[in-house]
């Protein structure tokens, strides 16, 4: 049921983005929860919705994430978290996962009133970092996020976790790895090559 709910949430958010009917991502999450429950013939009480909202703030990170992010940061790369959630929810999630200190910035698409994969959030991230959009590399485990970032002009990397596949109609990311550790290894290798080419 969780996969159905998440898929419905992303679908609702994409429809809103395409049609220009912006709603905060949390509103899509709750609407998708209601739709999924209705499809399953389950009645939701307000307490149930509040419990799901609270759980979204306490999602655990995959085991390799903390060390992979720290390796990237310690190599001198600037890290920013870019999410469709509000900044408040994103900060709560990162705090709970013990990752907040690895990021220079926590950015929300909510700031620009357009959800990813619209180009505005990616461009806002580049602007907040003070770099050109083509100097940003988005790392994501969702093909739609990689597609949006690529269309906005970012370099991309895809975390191909089990069940996650790339859209064959979208330009393939420069980096693909089975988990964030593999992606970090590849990014650091690219950075070393770039350093050797610089005069």
Give the location of each predicted region:
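A metal-dependent, Asp-based hydrolase signature
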Residues: 7, 11-51
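Short, acidic loop-to-helix structural element flanking the phosphoryl-transfer center
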Residues: 22, 26-27, 44-81, 91, ...
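Asp-based, Mg2+/Mn2+-dependent phosphohydrolase catalytic module
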Residues: 66, 70-73, 86-199
